[in-house]
Structures are given as C-alpha cells and as structure tokens.
C-alpha cells in the first residue's frame, strides 16, 4: 500500500541527514511544494545556517507555521532498530530521526496548507512558513535572525503555530501556549590555593561558597501563577581542585540555571543572586547567559482556534501548559505575535529509535488545516 501524502513527505524529509546546522536539502523539498502554491520564496543564509521565509499574500492577518529542519545526532547506530535516516513504518509507527522533532510536523504543515488552499483559495489574510536549520544548535543564526530581518522591514506576524512536539500521551492532548524563560549563571568563586595541612595559609572557596549555594537553592523565587509553575533554580555543574587530595583549591566554578515565570524578570533574578552572594562576602566573578524570556499567549484568536481544532479532531479539549524547555517560539513572541506550540507526542524525541504514530501525523494535519480555517476563513 502506498504512503499517504503526509507520510510520503515526512519520509522524504527524514531521509536527509540534516544534523544541526545542516539542512541537507530539506528546505528545497518544501520550496518545491510551496512554489506550486504561489508562495514567494526567500532563503536567508547566515553563516552556517539556512533559513526559509515563504509567504503567500500581502494582507493581514499573517498566519505563520514555524519549525526546523535540523535534527540532533543519531548517536550509537548499533542501538537503533532501523537506520536513523532510513524512515520505516513498523506496527503503525514511523521510525527515524526527526519523526517527532520535527520533520513529521513539517510534512503536516505543507499538506495542511495544500488542502486548505484547495478548498479556500480566496481566504483572508496571508500564510507564511519560517523554517530554520539552527534550532537544535546554538540558535544564533536561525529564527532570531529571520525575525530581526522581518522586523527591520516592518513585516508583522499576527499568529504563529510552532510545530514542536508538544503532546504527551496522544497528539493534541497538550498545547503549549507559553514557555518559561531560561537564564544561566557561570560563577567563579575565588580563594587562595594552599596545602590542606596549612588551612590558615589558604582560603578555601568551596567552604565559603557552599552556604551561599544552599541559600540560593532554598530560596522561594516566586510562587508562579495561573499559567506558570514557580521559578526553578538548579545547580548544573560544579568544578574545583587539582585532583590531588592534599591541595586546597584556589577557585570554585559553579554553573546554575533558572527556569523562570512571568512573575520575575531576568534583571530581578540577577539582582537577588548578587545580593545573596555579596551577603556571604564572596570574592567572585559571575557571567550571565539569557537564553530566552518567558512568554504567554493566554487569549485571542489563535488559542481559541487551536483549542477548537484539537477538540474537533480528538473530541476532547487540550490542556494549555507552559512546561518544558525553551523553543524558537520565544523569538517570535517578542514581536507581540500570538504563539502556540502544537505537535506530535514527545516521548521519543532526542532518543535512539525516535518514532511517532503514523496516524498521529494524519490527525495533526487535520488539526493544522482546521486552525487555518478558523483563523483565515
């Protein structure tokens, strides 16, 4: 039996070894389909990253599908049941790297647009796709650079679906209508190196830092709100010493991360952390890396359309959550656009034997098409 249009396209994309930041021709496959639909194609290459901005129409509102063609490395090939870049259906599941994250979603986007335009060629507004090959990597030259380009020419996105695998047990059971912010601190506490037998001649930075770290870990940063859990502080890495048991270290390196809600700003986090470190009298350097601000789309046309579309297909309402890591939605949300994430089940993402139910991709295609209908008809 031949594959359905969405499965055939998903397999075509998945067969391409597009480990970040490689695109491996995936965007060319999408472009060939979009050109037949009269999309204006714009390829934006920034350093090692290939980005696609494809738009049909010039009127508002502008509805955008956003996603990425890059995937994480396959890892040990011996642990895969099937070759990771030879997509195969086994017992109703489509296996291969990118099945869930997120080439399956890309196929659903394209096919849903094709079907929507066949039925509604004179729809209101415009449709676009924003696709990058730099989501799984450092995310420097991908979506954020495309957004900078669009903003510079006053091209405004009104609504955006990001095809990240948002679902937990069944496709569409969870819709992400926001994400927590993420900020990382790289802390170096300075002391004086010495012999462990002569502690009075040294200054142990580990001993001095531990009470401060304990206070940071015990602090209630906020209580969250209706949409976000309380802000989380986690120590990720610790490093100190020479490896010898008789040397007091001269420095202590600590890396920690905050996943923060809309109750806090990155500025407030920095101020409170510095206040605690200073109160403990530490001599330190602290470098901050902000990965993204929290964002929330709590009401409006898009959330209503997505919830209704999922309910039409699944006959149950999805949960609206903000859990999980960061996504490229944060770069789009900063423009004021309504942003929602809707995609496949995420149980196997970034794992060996990544897979997704083939039937789920058919459902997701239907959901995307219904969102378009509810937003642009």
From Swiss-Prot:
Binds 2 Zn(2+) or Co(2+) ions per subunit. CDD domains: M20_DapE_proteobac. Zn(2+) 1 binds at residues 68, 101, 164. Its EC number is 3.5.1.18. InterPro entries: ArgE/DapE_CS, Bact_exopeptidase_dim_dom, DapE_proteobac, Peptidase_M20, Peptidase_M20_dimer, Peptidase_M20A. Gene3D superfamilies: Zn peptidases. One of its GO terms (molecular function) is succinyl-diaminopimelate desuccinylase activity. Zn(2+) 2 binds at residues 101, 136, 350. The keyword Zinc applies. The keyword tRNA-binding does not apply. The active site is at 70, 135 (proton acceptor). Keywords: Amino-acid biosynthesis, Cobalt, Diaminopimelate biosynthesis, Hydrolase, Lysine biosynthesis, Metal-binding, Zinc. It is an enzyme of class 3 (hydrolase). GO terms for biological process: diaminopimelate biosynthetic process; L-arginine biosynthetic process; lysine biosynthetic process via diaminopimelate. Its cofactor is Zn(2+); Co(2+). HAMAP family: DapE (MF_01690). Catalyzes the hydrolysis of N-succinyl-L,L-diaminopimelic acid (SDAP), forming succinate and LL-2,6-diaminopimelate (DAP), an intermediate involved in the bacterial biosynthesis of lysine and meso-diaminopimelic acid, an essential component of bacterial cell walls. Homodimer. Belongs to the peptidase M20A family. DapE subfamily. This is Succinyl-diaminopimelate desuccinylase. The gene is dapE.
């Amino acid at each position: 039996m031949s594959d359905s249009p969405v499965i055939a396209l998903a397999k075509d994309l998945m067969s391409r070894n597009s480990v970040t930041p490689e695109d491996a021709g995936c965007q060319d496959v999408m472009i060939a389909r979009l050109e037949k639909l009269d999309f204006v194609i714009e390829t934006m290459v920034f350093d090692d990253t290939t980005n696609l901005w494809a738009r049909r129409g010039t009127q508002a509102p502008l509805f955008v599908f956003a996603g990425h063609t890059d995937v994480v490395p396959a890892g040990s090939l011996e642990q895969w049941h099937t070759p990771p870049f030879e997509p195969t259906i086994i017992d109703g599941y489509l296996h291969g790297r990118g099945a869930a994250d997120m080439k399956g979603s890309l196929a659903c986007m394209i096919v849903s647009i094709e079907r929507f335009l066949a039925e509604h060629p004179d729809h209101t507004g415009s449709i676009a796709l924003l696709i990058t090959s730099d989501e799984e990597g450092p995310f420097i030259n991908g979506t954020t650079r495309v957004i900078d380009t669009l903003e510079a020419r006053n091209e405004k996105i009104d609504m955006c679906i990001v095809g990240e695998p948002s679902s937990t047990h069944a496709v569409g059971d969870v819709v992400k209508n926001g994400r927590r912010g993420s900020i990382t601190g790289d802390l170096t506490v300075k002391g004086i190196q010495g012999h462990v037998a002569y502690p009075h001649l040294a200054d142990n930075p580990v001993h001095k830092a531990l009470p401060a770290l304990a206070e940071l870990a015990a602090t209630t940063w906020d209580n969250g709100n209706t949409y976000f859990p309380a802000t989380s502080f986690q120590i990720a890495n610790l490093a100190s010493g020479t490896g010898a048991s008789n040397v007091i270290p001269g420095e202590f390196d600590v890396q920690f991360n905050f996943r923060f809600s809309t109750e806090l700003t990155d500025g407030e986090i920095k101020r409170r952390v510095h206040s605690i470190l200073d109160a403990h009298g530490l001599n330190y350097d602290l470098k901050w890396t902000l990965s993204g601000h929290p964002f929330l789309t709590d009401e409006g046309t898009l959330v209503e359309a997505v919830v209704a579309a999922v309910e039409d297909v699944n006959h149950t309402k999805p949960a609206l959550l903000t859990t999980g890591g960061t996504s490229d939605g944060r770069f789009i949300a900063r423009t004021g656009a309504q942003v929602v994430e809707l995609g496949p089940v995420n149980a196997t993402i970034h794992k060996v034997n990544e897979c997704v139910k083939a039937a789920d991709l058919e459902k997701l295609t239907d959901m995307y098409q219904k969102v378009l209908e509810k937003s642009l008809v």
